[in-house]
Amino acid sequence: MDAAPAISRPETRSSWLFGCAAIAAAALLVGVTVAFHGPMTFRPLGVRVQMGDAMRPLAIAAVADVALFAFAFRRCAWRRVASVLAVAIVAVSVLAAARRAAPAYPVSDRALIELATINALDGRQLYGPYSRYGWQHPGPMLFYLLAPFYAAAGSRTAGLAAGALAINLAALAAAIWVLIRHAGPALTVTFTALFALYFARVPGLVVSSWNAHATIVASAALVVISAAVAAGQIRLLPLFLAVASFVLQTHVATFPLVAVTAALVVAAIGRRWIGASAEERAGLKAQANRAAWVLAALWLLPLVEELSRPAGNMSAMWQFARQPPRGGTLPQAFDAWASALTGVFHAGLSLPQGRLIVRSMAAWPRVVAVLHLLLLAAVVVWAARHRRHVHAWMAAQSLAGSVAALWAVTRIPDGIHDHEVFWISAVGVVGAASIAAAVVGSVVSERRPLVRSRGPLVAGLSATLLLIGVPLEGLRQITVTGGPSRSKAADDHVMRVTGAIQSEIERQGSRRPMVVIDQRVWDWAAGVILQLRRQGVRVVIDDGLVAMFAGTLAPDGSEDLEISFCGGPCHERLISRPGNIVVLLTDHIAIDARPLHR
């Protein structure tokens, strides 16, 4: 009797690859269906199986995808399939968690962020986030990036957390990809290790959609990508401009970082142009043309807003920037800058909440910050001598960005707040990674056979662990809290005020209610206006505040009900006016109404 033909190892491995991919794809499809359409019932082989939790099939998909990665380690095509599946599994898992998160009732800036995101879904958002100085940040990129996740999450606040996680993961992945491809194992490992420490210190960062938080990881990616472009990777120029546009449009405090990185990139490209051949110049022109189109597309809406009115938002920002410096003293600015730059090693590191910074008496952050700059300068020289061009430019960009940040802090008026300098901590982490990689490189030569063979493996493993750990932590944050911070007492208060106002609007039969806000309670008013907008009620507000409260209407004389939010003596004045109605009176806020008969 003839023996059965032996199955070769390549055929066996291919069977395992196809099997893992099929299981991952099928489980992912089930997870998507359950997440977006509700529970499902299957009858495989006549057995009734009900699936009501999307996380179970997604967990199966994740396990199968990990197995696919393991079997496809040396096969590029299958690694790409596994990577695509991994991105899809993470995205669906995060959205599934956001869709089942408890309803949230944000106030203050977070309510304004959600209002602007709703406005972006309607295609009407032209402004960036609101600034306490009376203008808006330069552009609305943040809101248009958050909008798809918000919609996919069923218009829940947790969808903003999902969008923030996606933005941070994309920025982090871009930075790590650039480092692996162009910078070498040492810089990749130190970068991932320090950012793992950074995220562990401020875990809520990865899911926060507040603009002061949403630009942190992107700022670090900006430094890394700009270094690669300056070192000769011109094809990354469109990516650099996209990240720079996002960072600047979302938080104008990062202007010094964007300006110096762009200046060094332009200088490097100019130097390359001078010695380039005709063929190389043609390539540079092609990349510059692509970059120009990217820049034009990303800045179209801010330009439309600026040119569509006599005094646009950019004009207001320019007038503010031209004012004489009203910042604090140089010692105060230096202390705030030093604490931010060394923040990853600082015991008091926490997510900023808009609090005024109290000057620290500790001397070590100042000493370490100055030493940090000196070491970065030394790393630039060392890396250039060893022809580690990306490393040299990364240290140079970190050094220039840190110095520019100090200048910027000296110009902050009306006291230095934590959210205005927090972005500097990301630049500090990138600089620390540059220094640490130089130390490792000077001790362990990359020419050693063991380092050359195992270094990329260690770098890939560290990157993989970070890119797995960040979404897992983000998923935990969304699952447990629905976002970076929640307060049940605040939620209950917003619900109570919203319910009272909505009842009064219905009782009066109002079709165009107008809201008047006492500055002392604008944060609560923002939360209530958001809840009304969710329920389809768009209120009229003072013309000067329409940009701040996105989606509200400007007065036109047809308003039929005035609703006042009071947090102080204004309530005592209002109750004496004819026709006043006390809608609600609490320890925090007073709501008065008055019919308008025109």
Regions from the PLM with identified roles:
Residues 48, 52-57, 215-218, 251, ...:
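Hydrophobic/aromatic-rich transmembrane helices and adjacent perimembrane loops
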Residues 140, 144, 152-170, 205-212, ...:
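Loop-to-helix entry region of an early transmembrane alpha helix in multi-pass inner-membrane enzymes
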Residues 76-80, 180-187, 233, 272-289, ...:
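Membrane-interface helix-loop-helix junctions at transmembrane boundaries of multi-pass membrane enzymes
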Residues 162-184, 190, 221, 378-381:
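Transmembrane-helix motifs of polytopic, lipid-linked glycan transferases
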Residues 9-13, 222-239, 247, 272-276:
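Membrane-interface transmembrane helices that cradle and orient dolichyl/undecaprenyl
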Residues 223-225, 237-265, 294-297:
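Membrane-interface alpha helices of multi-pass inner-membrane proteins
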Residues 116-119, 273, 287-374:
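Transmembrane-lumen/periplasm boundary regions of multi-pass, lipid-linked membrane glycan transferases
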Residues 112-144, 148, 326-328:
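Extracytosolic helix-loop segments that constitute the early lumenal/periplasmic catalytic or substrate-binding loops
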